[in-house]
């Protein structure tokens, strides 16, 4: 291999992405999981923890069963599942389908975990919703709990972290902004040991904010993610995310109805290049 003038780095790990090359984790098929694994490996990502969406319960179970049946060996290794929905706040649903949003449910989670063969490594929730704090108490020792799609204030987020939540899903996105009198989830995360996800595709977060975030959290607590959807690796056009139509132009993916950002169309390796080359974060 001729590598003069290049960097040689370990393979990346993407703990939060939905799809690529017209396939999605929520398809619930071996074909789609293998397509994700192949594309990611070809783009420098050697371990994947794809995310599910807020979708009908039967479809969620099918996605879990498909993951359980997948055999690693070709492409990136499937090392877990990030369960992004359905335990979120409707006010911050983003590109998630409102009709499938549910209150945090320990029994449902355990059934999904059984269907997945224990592969769920992250479960996301809005801590201000009914039953969420009790949910954290009951599952914190068996799965990482991530604060996501939330309207939580500083005190509520801090209490969730005290109870065992140790991760923040796509910091800044689908949560109240940092305010000097109402620091919210972002402030609570800063004052804790939580890991925080950043979508650094150049669309979701302004470069100045990314640089400030690295100053606040350091690279020891920041997890770069792609949050990519099925248009990644494809041409512009019409796609789908969580059962909703998505329009993709360049690297910008938005819901066709409403215009909300609907994941990214950028793989993790390209996100990392953007962070280093365009946002000037030291490599």
Residues covered by each model-derived region:
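Conserved phosphate-binding/catalytic loop of the ribokinase/pfkB sugar-kinase fold
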Residues: 89-115
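A general structural motif
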Residues: 102, 127, 149-153, 175-182, ...
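Active-site core of metal-dependent hydrolases
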Residues: 110-234
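His/Asp/Glu-enriched, well-ordered alpha-helical/loop segment
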Residues: 188-198, 214-226, 231-283
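Conserved, mostly hydrophobic/aromatic
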Residues: 5, 16, 40, 83, ...
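Active-site mouth loops of central-metabolism enzymes
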Residues: 19-31, 95-102, 144-148
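Divalent metal-dependent hydrolysis catalytic cores, especially in the metallo-beta-lactamase
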Residues: 18, 34-63, 76-89, 116-128, ...
């Amino acid at each position: 291999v001729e590598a003069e003038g290049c960097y040689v780095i370990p393979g990346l790990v993407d703990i939060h992405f939905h799809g690529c090359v017209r396939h999605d984790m929520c398809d619930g098929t071996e074909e789609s999981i293998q397509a994700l694994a192949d594309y990611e490996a070809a783009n420098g990502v050697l371990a994947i923890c794809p995310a599910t969406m807020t979708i009908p319960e039967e479809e969620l179970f099918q996605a879990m069963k498909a993951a359980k049946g997948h055999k690693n060996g070709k492409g990136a290794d499937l090392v877990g599942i990030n369960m992004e929905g359905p335990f979120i706040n409707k006010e911050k649903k983003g590109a998630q389908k409102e009709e499938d949003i549910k209150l945090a449910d320990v029994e449902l989670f355990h059934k999904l975990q059984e269907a997945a063969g224990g592969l769920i490594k992250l479960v996301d929730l809005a801590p201000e919703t009914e039953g969420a704090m009790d949910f954290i108490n009951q599952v914190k020792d068996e799965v990482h709990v991530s604060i996501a799609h939330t309207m939580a204030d500083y005190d509520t987020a801090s209490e969730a972290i005290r109870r065992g939540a140790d991760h923040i899903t796509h910091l800044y996105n689908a949560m109240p902004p940092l305010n000097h009198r109402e620091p919210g989830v972002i402030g609570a995360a800063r004052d804790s040991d939580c890991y925080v996800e950043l979508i650094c595709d150049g669309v979701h977060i302004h470069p100045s904010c990314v640089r400030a975030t690295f100053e606040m959290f350091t690279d020891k607590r920041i997890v770069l993610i792609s949050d990519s959807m099925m248009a990644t690796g494809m041409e512009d056009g019409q796609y789908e995310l969580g059962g909703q139509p998505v329009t993709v132009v360049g690297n910008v993916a938005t819901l066709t109805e409403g215009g909300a950002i609907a994941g990214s169309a950028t793989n993790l390796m390209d996100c990392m290049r953007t962070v280093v080359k365009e946002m000037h974060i030291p490599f």
